[in-house]
Structure formats: structure tokens, C-alpha cells
């Protein structure tokens, strides 16, 4: 779906990954959310009769399950436990947006990137919990924070120089990580 389209379905990613982005008049993208297998996207207009707030773009070949809006709302009414779990998910995403806006307001790229990495580590998102590898590209971090890729690269180099992250073989790792030692991480070799 595209930003501005009318919502007719609940969407859940069965397999793959989807970027949920806004594009400005210059064609620059702002990454609102990177959804992976098992996650839903585009939920807002299911509840407020508005249009999609952002566009969904598959990152890799992706299978998405769609449930008509009326059936989804009926499901929530009939199963309060699902409704509460779904509400908790929306609150978690809203809390992340508040966090990110606060950090962006600091205007310090190094601090914005470090805070984002720490948040992702704390919430076990886009960080390999075995080896500490940051599973977002520098471009994705730039799109999430509204910074230029070059600014993110500089900030990450500074964080590496300060020992707050490690950059090994062009991959970034959380503080205290020694990198992905071959044969030790089930996810990365």
C-alpha cells in the first residue's frame, strides 16, 4: 500500500521484511518502521478511518497476509486478549517514536545514533542477541533518524573510536561485543 491510500485490510508479514516509509517532495525517504516476519504494518487507519500514514515497501521477497478490516475489527471485539496485545504493540511503537523524537531534538548525531543503538539493544530489536551485531544498515539508521548517511557513518566512527561500539569487517557491534567469531554465533556463522 502507499501513503494516502484508503485502508481496507489488516496486514501481517508472514515471511520477509517491509520498510514503512514517508517520502518528501525531494524523494528522500524517512523510515518509520522496519517490520519483519510476524509483525503487522499500517494499523492506524484501521481505527481512525484515515488513510495510510506511510508507504509499505518490501525489502526482500515477502509474503503478507491480509485480513479484511471488518473481520479484523470483529476479531478484536470478540477476543479482548488479542485487543489488549494489539494495543500494547501500538503503545510500544508510539513509545519508540517519542523516544526517537526526543533524541533527534538533541541535534547531536553521535548521541542520536548511540541512543538508537542502546534502545534497540534494550528492546531486542535489530540487534543479534548472540554476537551483538547491529542488523540495520547505516542507510536505515539515517532514514530512521532523518540524518544523512554520511553523518551516520561519521557518528559511528566516533562511537567506534570512543569504544562505545565496535566496527569490524564493515559490520557494527554493540558496546562490549568482540564481533561475530566464526562458528560461535548461530545466526551469523
Feature annotation, model-predicted:
Residues 17, 61-63, 171:
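Structural motif
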Residues 25-32:
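Short alpha-helix-to-loop micro-motif enriched in aromatics/charged/Gly
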Residues 32-91, 95:
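Cyclic-nucleotide recognition modules
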Residues 77, 81-148:
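Polybasic "coupling" helices that flank or enter modular domains
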Residues 121-189:
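Phosphate-/nucleic-acid-contacting segments
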Amino acid at each position: 500500500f502507499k501513503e494516502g491510500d484508503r485502508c481496507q485490510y489488516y496486514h501481517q508479514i508472514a515471511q520477509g521484511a517491509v520498510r514503512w516509509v514517508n517520502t518528501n517532495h525531494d524523494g528522500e525517504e524517512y523510515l518509520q518502521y522496519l517490520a519483519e516476519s510476524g509483525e503487522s504494518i499500517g494499523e492506524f487507519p484501521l481505527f481512525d478511518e484515515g488513510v495510510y500514514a506511510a508507504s509499505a515497501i518490501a525489502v526482500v521477497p515477502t509474503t503478507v497476509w491480509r485480513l479484511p478490516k471488518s473481520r479484523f475489527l470483529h476479531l478484536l471485539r470478540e477476543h479482548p486478549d488479542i485487543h489488549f496485545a494489539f494495543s500494547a504493540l501500538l503503545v510500544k511503537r508510539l513509545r519508540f517514536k517519542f523516544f526517537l523524537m526526543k533524541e533527534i531534538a538533541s541535534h547531536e548525531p553521535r548521541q542520536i545514533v548511540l541512543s538508537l543503538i542502546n534502545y534497540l539493544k534494550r528492546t531486542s530489536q535489530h540487534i543479534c542477541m548472540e554476537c551483538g551485531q547491529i542488523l540495520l544498515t547505516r542507510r536505515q539508521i539515517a532514514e530512521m533518524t532523518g540524518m544523512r548517511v554520511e553523518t551516520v557513518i561519521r557518528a559511528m566512527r566516533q562511537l567506534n573510536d570512543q569504544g562505545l561500539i565496535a566496527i569490524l569487517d564493515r559490520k557494527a557491534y554493540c558496546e562490549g561485543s568482540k564481533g561475530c567469531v566464526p562458528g560461535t554465533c548461530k545466526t551469523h556463522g
